[in-house]
Structures are given as structure tokens and as C-alpha cells.
Amino acid sequence: QYAPEWVWAQNQDLPAPGVRGMGNTYTGNISDQPDRFGTDAFVRGYTGQSYVKAHLGPLAIGLSSENIFWGPGRFAGIVMTDNAPGIRHFTFETNKPLKTRWGTLEGQLISGKKMRSGFIYTTGPNADGSSLPEVVRAPELDTVFSVITAAAGVWNPIWLPGLSLGITREIWTEGPVSADASERDYIALFYTNPFRGAGGGTEVDVDQMASLFFRYVMPESHAEFYGEYGFDDNRYDLEDLLVSPEHSRAYLIGFNKLQSISGNTEYIDFTYEITQLEGSKEMINRIQFGYPVFYDSDYNHYGQQIGSGIGNGSNQWIVSVDHVKNNRRIGLIYERIARNNDKLYAGQVPWVATWYGFDFTKKYVDSSLGVNYQERFGPILFWGKALLTQTYNWNHWYDPAGTSSPMRANGYNVKSLNVFVGCTIFI
């Protein structure tokens, strides 16, 4: 399959965040997440959802640049999503469930390269005299990559129809390795200790992530319940895992229900989903440098997060209600995202402190209400979404024109309208 992708974006100027916290953008260029991709329009071409695979019965092997979405989430995922462009990778996977006496098994093993964005932060002050470094183009990084190898497996036990249990594990090199990559880096998943996280084919350190997930489908009720629990920082040993399971954790939980209103052709589709990436208090005193984040290391591809796209240390919950009839879907959606709480709780925001102290109530939150639409006409599928968003404390900015009180700082609140439209042509 050859399905390339081309992206054009205005990449307009925007105010830089008041402070770049380590959970958002590392000032030392450790985590490749630019606030802005240079000053020109963003134009990129990718091989997209292309692949070459050989199918051998229930198994497939090949090369691919497809996006991978692991986990049960409907709106988000923890370890692998379509937020970043697809990674070019080798894949060995099942193309249909493998039947065993204990139930069915599905899985995928990948090994590939995640690329740098091609932008870095300068070390000196900006031209306007501010202390935040600028994002500048670095063409020498266009060919620099690091290695990622990952696997996911799903078991559907024969004794509990409708239940799926899954596990994922990802290993990647920290920092660019480029031509110094060893063959061992591409198979690090098979020999890296799940507790110590040590070992690699080169001098480059490795990092790892893992998750457990489930999905329970109730066909007679037209409903499902699902969840995922992820770990970003490897444990010292089994004791550490059992004593502090909340360390470096993220979780996702959701519920979906289809309520028939006219036979099998018309439904009300209700979904509720929560994604929590903000770390627990365990992470403040451990090796995440005092920043309560998930994705604390360089888990990015072309400068975009491979996992959930809501941002490090962010939380999201979504409620959607759709009317579905034949080929048409229309409905309402409410979405709340608390962005970059890691920066807030680490004191990395430009608030003017009140007499009471630092104001931790001023979270950077997007509260959005919108409509969804999707309908197919012959070979063409049209879709669209419009969101009216009220943003509180945008970018953690302080508003000097606001009215303060002894207990609260002045947040900068804004409104915006976001419209998304698209179509897919089936050939």
C-alpha cells in the first residue's frame, strides 16, 4: 500500500510560554518538542500510511510507516497513537487472532527509527532581550535519529467472552545515536532488564515504557468498558513496583454505550473517557527532576509526541453524545484539557505571587463545547468538528490588567473557535 501524506500549516507567530518547564520543553534540548517549528510555514511530506508486507497465514511481516495505535482508548492513548507522523519501522504482527485452547492471541513487534524535528533552542537571550531561548533551524539534525523497539500483545480468554487483556512495552535510546546505532539497539526489547533499564548496543542510554490495558465488551447491552495503566519510569526491582505502583503512572479509562432507538439502523452513541498524564506526588521526589510528568524523556518523532497529544503533565476528559443513523453521525462533544500541570506544580509559571503564596488554583485549562458531523455519500466520507473553547489562564500567563485579590493571581482568559473539516475518498 502506498499512501503518502503532505502537511501544510501557517505556523504563525505566537507568544512563547512565560517559562519553559522541563515537562513541556527542555531548555537543554533534551526533549525534542519545539514550541514552534521555525518562522516559516510548516511544509512536510511523509511516506504516511504506506507499507510492504508479506502475509503468511495469520501472520504478517514487512516494512511500514503506518501510524500505530495501541490500547483501548477511543479518543486518546498512552503509549502509541497517531499524534505524531508514523515511524518507519520493521513489523511482525498478526493479521487475525491466533486460536489457542486458552483463547485467542493478537500481537505486534516493531523496530524502527524516530527522527529529530530539525530545530534546537539557542543558548543565549533573544533579540528582544528576554531570557527565553529562540527555536532555530538545525539542518544537521535532519538525518539524526534514535532507535525504538516495542511490542504489544492481546489475549482474549476463552472463559470470559468479550474480555480482552493487553500489555505493551517500549524501549528507545535516549538522545540521538545516528550512525552509531548498533544492531543490538534494534532488538533491545529482548535483553533489556525491565527493572534496571540498563544495557544497549552502544554507549547511549535507553529508556522504557510499559502499560497494561483491558477492554470488556457487552454485546447484548451494546456497551463496552475499557482502561489502560502505563508506567514511564522503570522500577528498581519488584519491591519498588509493588510498594509504589503510582510512581510515573498514567491512566486512561472510558465507557461507551450504543442505545438503539429504531431497530438496528438508528442509535444514540454515548462515550465518556478520561486520560490522566499528570504524575502523582511520588514523582516530585524521584528522578523526574521534580516535575510531575509522563513522557519525561525524549519520546518524540519529528518533534511531536508519539503518545497522547495533550501534552506532558496534562489531563483530559471527554463526553460525547452522537445520533447515528445509517451513514450519518451528528452529535455534541464536551472536552476539558488541563494543560501542563507539571509546570504549575513545579513553580515554572510566571505568576505574581499573592500574599498567601504561590497560586496553584490558576491552572491552564481549555473548556470546549462543540458539534461533530460525519456522513458518507458513495465513495466520499465527509467529516467535520467545530469547538467553541474558553481558555482559562492561557499559557500560564499573568494578566496585569486583571483585578486581583489577596488570595488569587490574575489569569489571562481567552475565547476561540476551532473548526476542522475533511473528507476521505475510497477508491
Segments predicted by a language model, with ranges:
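Outer-membrane beta-barrel channel domains
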Residues: Q1-W159, L241-R249, S262-E273, P292-N312
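Exposed, low-structure sequence patches enriched in small/polar residues
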Residues: N156-I427
